[in-house]
Amino acid sequence: MSDLTKKDDEYWRDKLDAEQFRICREKGTERPFTGEYCDSKEPGTYLCRCCAEPLFESATKYDSGSGWPSFFQPIKGDAVGEIKDTSHGMVRVEVVCHNCGCHLGHVFPDGPKPTGLRYCINSASIQLQKEGAE
């Protein structure tokens, strides 16, 4: 992880709007079917909202019916970190940006082939870099 993991709340509040801060830095969750990228089919690369690290390719995005953008694998194996999450009386696996620690969402073992995984990601935690844009 980079030095971004050591930044304080004030640093992130200056960079993110209130909803993005709640989700990315306080491990919040956006309401299902409300996120900007829930239904997006635009080609490109999804970057971390906090640090612009590439996380997911649109080619791995699919409609899981969950109400959140879902991907079957990250752009590379070490793009995201996984942390055991026992909040809210459940046992889940939290997904974070490996570069800055941004809360992205959770990963579940009910996704499609080839991985069988569903990375259920908050739209507020990512931003789409459209294909051909830099």
Swiss-Prot record:
Gene Ontology molecular-function annotations: peptide-methionine (R)-S-oxide reductase activity; zinc ion binding
Cofactors, names only: Zn(2+)
UniProt keyword Nucleotide-binding, yes or no: no
GO cellular component assignments: cytoplasm
Keyword terms: Metal-binding, Oxidoreductase, Zinc
EC number: 1.8.4.12
GO BP annotation list: protein repair; response to oxidative stress
Cofactor note: Binds 1 zinc ion per subunit. The zinc ion is important for the structural integrity of the protein.
Catalytic activity line of the entry: L-methionyl-[protein] + [thioredoxin]-disulfide + H2O = L-methionyl-(R)-S-oxide-[protein] + [thioredoxin]-dithiol
Domain spans labelled MsrB: 9-131
Residues of the signal peptide: none
Active-site residues per Swiss-Prot or TrEMBL entry: 120 (nucleophile)
Binding locations of Zn(2+): 48, 51, 97, 100
Listed InterPro entries: Met_Sox_Rdtase_MsrB, Met_Sox_Rdtase_MsrB_dom, Mss4-like_sf
Name of one Pfam family that matches: SelR
UniProt record similarity statement: Belongs to the MsrB Met sulfoxide reductase family.
Protein name, entry field: Peptide methionine sulfoxide reductase MsrB
Organism of this sequence: Saccharophagus degradans (strain 2-40 / ATCC 43961 / DSM 17024)
Gene expressing this chain: msrB
